[in-house]
Amino acid sequence: YQLYAPVFVDATGNGTLGYYAGAEYRKGSEPQSEFGELHAPQQPNNYRMGNSILLKAKDMGHPVKFTPPSFAKKLTEEQLAKRIHCVQMRDTINCDDSPNPEEYKRTSMTSSACVDYGYWWLELCGDGEDIITEYEAIRDDLIAYAYGIWDHIKNNKEGIHEHHAENYALEWVGALPGVRESRRLVGDYLLSETDILEHKIFEDAVCYGGWCVDLHAPHGLLDFNLLPSDCNFYDGVYTIPYRSYYSKNIKNLYMAGRDISTTRLGLASTRIIGCCAIGGEAVGIAAALCNKYACDPRELAPHVKELQQLILKEDGFLPGFKNEDEKDLALKAKITASSWEQGGEPEKVANGISRKLGEEQNGWVTKPGECLIMKWDETKEIREIRLTFESNFAYPIRVTMAPLRQAQQRNGVPEELVKDVKIELYREGKKTGEAFVKDNYQRLCSVGIGDVPADEIRVIPESTNGAEQAVLRALRVYAK
């Protein structure tokens, strides 16, 4: 097949599209001399983080025997001494070779200290030069080690740890390994570890990240004497520039996901799925703008502020940036309310920041049934009102199949979300229209008004999904 398009996006992970198109790419580690990265090696290498599969077990309520298949790889307690795989290892594992032993132990325990689901450290990197072509061979070895690990957990009686897995039956073993690292396509800028540790705010920022600089052992599980991950933690977040999302030498190629333009240490943070997701959203918006202006990705640079404002409009977040949309009438309105809590004054719905940051509310905090009033000196034909509600970004949501972790998650709609909203429009004191939002389950809610003339709107959050406070983080208003 031959596909023709003005712009392509390589979101393959392996940089497959870019590779076949002749895009410049990198693999392995850059030397410290190239970017001055704190944790870079003195010499370049072809190390890569490995592929992983997971396994899942179920408590049957009675003892269950396990006989390993013939291909299972035998593992000893000594070999797994650096791999947390049961609660008892909380007190015995030696993390002294971690840059931050206590933080490492805490974060590792979150996902590994159970026998019913794991393990992120079940990781292999292959034997050759190209982890991509070795994918199936690595998969076969991973499956063999997965059964070997389960055999160890079920049947090993020689170690110092009691695994307490007598009643557990192996329920599922993954068949498609997750990939952490392969090719990185080169753009006009390579994000480095230095940028991350310095929390750099780029003028052309279109995405942000906050995961630690998380490099795994060079040979994965087979580095038995090493901790599986070398996590370098830091406070705060960093931004990723637009220049890291398009190819340096293929003029109509974007990248999104883990194949964006970074050093290997940059990838150690940006590869996390949440960062990949919001970077993909930014690239999608950028591609639409390329269509609007009939230009290539690099040629879109003069319009990067428009791109940033569109990201914010869609409830994206860019540290160091705020809503400056000239079409947003809320930025020019007089705003008050029937009541509010200290720190959650009504005018903050138009301060340009749509989420709580530290102790700063950045929004109107009140009780259900109260009214926010927005006025203008002249009549507007209101077409759309965009409401951004509190959804509790501070609540940890873990994407996992672990029964223990799933039991800790709240089900359903966040209780903090406003559920029912009434919107009233007035012109010279007379009502000209109204709109309702019922059973809302979204953080960003767009309400089409239909070009109603008004010089005043009133927003009444009538109920929430359970919380006592009703919180409106942002309110945007657009006219005909």
Give the residues covered by each predicted segment.
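Short beta-strand-to-coil "C-cap" segments at the C-terminal boundary of structured domains/repeats
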Residues: 57-60, 473-480
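Short beta-strand-plus-loop segments that form exposed binding edges in beta-rich domains
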Residues: 460-467
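Disordered, acidic Ser/Thr/Pro-rich linker "stalks" and the adjacent N-terminal cap
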Residues: 313, 317-379, 390-417, 439-441, ...
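Flavin (FAD/FMN)-binding glycine-rich loop and adjacent Rossmann-like elements that form
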Residues: 1-327
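Extracellular carbohydrate recognition and processing domains
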Residues: 431-450
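Short beta-strand elements bearing conserved aromatic residues within extracellular beta-rich modules
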Residues: 421-423
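Extended extracellular/luminal ectodomain segments enriched in beta-structured repeat modules
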Residues: 369, 377-386, 453-456
